[in-house]
Amino acid sequence: MLVAYDIALDLVRALRPVVAQLRRYSPEAADQVERAASSIVLNLAEGRRRHGRDPRRFWDMAHGSAGEIRGALDLADAWGWQVDSAQARVLLDRELALLWGLTRRSRAKDASLLASGGTARPRQLGCGPSVRGSVAAWPASCG
């Protein structure tokens, strides 16, 4: 079991009162936090069932969702909304660190494989990583 998964569930529990407070100011922001928190848990659950390079894709999505929650909490502060998010922020910081470690470790593993002459993924003519946002992605046509 991933520690990040357990922390993600704790984060959801800590966010319940935060979401209720957010809803008074912005139902849309509250819904976004709910979706992002659920996305973290669901992507970690799916990623841990995958093998090879595939888990990193789910960990990257979970990391992005955690960043969305941070943005929503920062936005609430910027608007001056009275939202007590201290406990949730502590768990969120831990979750972000764990997810960064998971994605970073996976990237380092790919880099060491490439440095040793191996390939991280079989190459086809015209295939290679492209960068979409901050996440390296393989074209769908590449096997």
Residue ranges of each PLM-predicted region?
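Amphipathic alpha-helical assembly/interaction segments
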Residues: 1-143
